[in-house]
Amino acid sequence: MNLSRRRILSGLGLGLAAPFVRPSYAAAGSLNVYNWADYIGETTIEDFQSETGISVVYDLYASTEEMQAKMLAGSTGYDVVLQAGLQLPQFLKAGIYQELDRTRLTNWGNLDAAVLKINEGFDAGNRHGVPYTWGTVGITYNMDMVNERLPGVDLSSLDVLFKPENAAKLADCGISLLDSPTDIGFMVLSWLGIAPENAGPADYDKMVAAFAQIRQYVTTFDNTNFLTALPNKEICVANTWSGDYGVAKARAAEAGVELNLQYFVPKTGVPAWFDIWCMPSDAQNTDSAYAFLDYMLRPDVVAKCTDYTGYANANRAATALVDPAISSDPAIYPDAQTLERMYTPKPMTEEQERLLTRAWAQIKAG
């Protein structure tokens, strides 16, 4: 297992993206894919090329803003793009993605009906995308370091982080929070008893106030470095996505470091996230795109993706093929108790996006 990634909800404001136009690839038997780094099986692209003879140009994006800029510019040359479910309605409204011809996806029946039902909230009828991976956002603790400082504390509560007296005791061993307002921000709103979809100006002010009490104890706002900082014991508390917890554990094991990490989903609720393969409206290699999408719906293919990235996939038929160490981990494949704590965020209004962006700037500035 290598560097896993889900940096998908760290940016807001589609209209702020700067234009970028990518060279077009229209050769027969070619495919242009746009995805997060290290967010697919180690040999998936190579295997697809070998099996189909289709030549793949595989581009990576490092931030939501970068992805938005390219897609909103149009004429990108991409045929398949990985899209965050929460932002999908905005992209559909802008006409970025085309409706899929389900008859060309012979492996569609492998998808989990429960995941498809949830995705209806982003895309009515699941007409524009193929669900790929999903998970939660939570807190990863170095149990030994945390228990030494806060013995007996309830780690299923965000009180561990957002009660100043607790955060002060953890400051010396390091606290990392995601630089992602729709993840940690929504978690804190839920902790405050506020439904994120109903949040207004006064609610975002309460969120800012909650962060202000602990801001001095936060080491960093980060979406990447905790994967190294946790195994190196440079931090003891990290707000992470579910799959990244598993990657940090694997990195420690590979380095021969004894590390007692555990991932907790706060009992006050957390947002679930879903990533979806989509086909841009201006895709030029649609035959190749359908071949790739159907390939990614194969249980054997997507199981290898989960084994490599550490993220649960949306393919019901693939679960039995996933490494048992992953499929049996409730942090990655949530149990019934964890599922009860999860909710699917509803798309934000433009006003809510503006308020959250402003609140997040205040929080990070301290």
What are these regions (language model features)?
Residues 27-91:
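Early extracytoplasmic/lumenal segment of secretory-pathway proteins
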Residues 1-16:
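N-terminal secretory signal peptides and thylakoid transit peptides that target proteins
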Residues 98-109, 159, 255-271, 280-283:
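Short beta-strand->loop
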Residues 228, 336-366:
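Conserved C-terminal helix/tail region of periplasmic/extracytoplasmic solute-binding proteins
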Residues 204-213, 219, 257-278:
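Periplasmic-binding protein-like
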Residues 26, 275, 280-341:
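Mature extracytoplasmic/periplasmic domains
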Residues 82-217, 224-231:
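Extracytoplasmic ligand-binding site segments that recognize negatively charged/polar headgroups
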